[in-house]
């Protein structure tokens, strides 16, 4: 029987030595996944790319989390692993399960639905946290509205003993929202995005875009601080809304820059359906170990039940193509006037959110709805927060937003 050597380079990367080329090729093919829209991309049209994303190099390099697939191929090819060299730093991760009263006498802040009450984790939040503690490298699908920020804060607190934690979120709004929860819980937290670059903190919250920019600037010597220096001492990486990060960028950060972090957890409301996107997350973080659906949260009374009322309008004009019809839908004055009147009537029953996909339509509606706020790309973070706080604290407010 043929044999090979497995070298575990760090927390995510592995390398095989002594494997025949044909076996390496079979493993490479087993870990290649099609990109559905590849045929529209220039590289594919020019014949420079086969339209697939691979997770095992012909040189023998791959990922720890793909070892199941790799060993299956080796078994079928009659190859055994005769030697394993593990170069990972030895870290004794030992966590005890937590209970709902983890935060003791700490209370929810002003503006929270449970303002002034003691912070008590919900049963499903305790379940998610304990699942993570039993699996130091894993992903869980947790629906939006489940309270992921308090879950993240709890995980950061628990892992303080092992070093710094880095929380990666998809946008600036989530940075400040997560920061508020960390501050309320009494954690030593800083943020890194835009013009706010707070260093030397136990816990750092940032966007994946900020890390990517810092990485590029470091390579070209354009930044005083290198990404390696920024990430020094990080032992825990928590990625919120994993599916919103660009697969390749996130994979590079987690498998190269953060390759030695022993604790890596991912939270997402939606597990990517495309295999190549999921495998990038799987390789970087770990397997999916749990799921809390929106339906479960509705059944528990955590999320509101949805009641959909369709307002059918009579549109008589005929349009020759989609773009022409879309232009009519968002710019026709009669139609927009009707929507404005409808919104003014609806807002009497409570706070109202109007989503638009054209700035021009949002501006027209803002003019038609008194005291409404329009949140779009150029609205500063502080102004966005004020708009969100008004919704939290008041009634009959209208927020118009692009999506």
Question: Language-model segments: which ranges?
Answer:
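N-terminal accessory nucleic-acid engagement/regulatory domains that precede
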Residues: 1-89
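Conserved pre-motif I regulatory segment
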Residues: 48-55, 82, 86-141
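Conserved interdomain hinge at the start of the Helicase C-terminal
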Residues: 155-156, 318-357, 361-368
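Conserved helicase ATPase core of P-loop NTP-dependent helicases/translocases
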Residues: 176, 188-200, 216, 353-355, ...
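Conserved helix/coil segment N-terminal to the catalytic DExD/H
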Residues: 194-236, 247-256
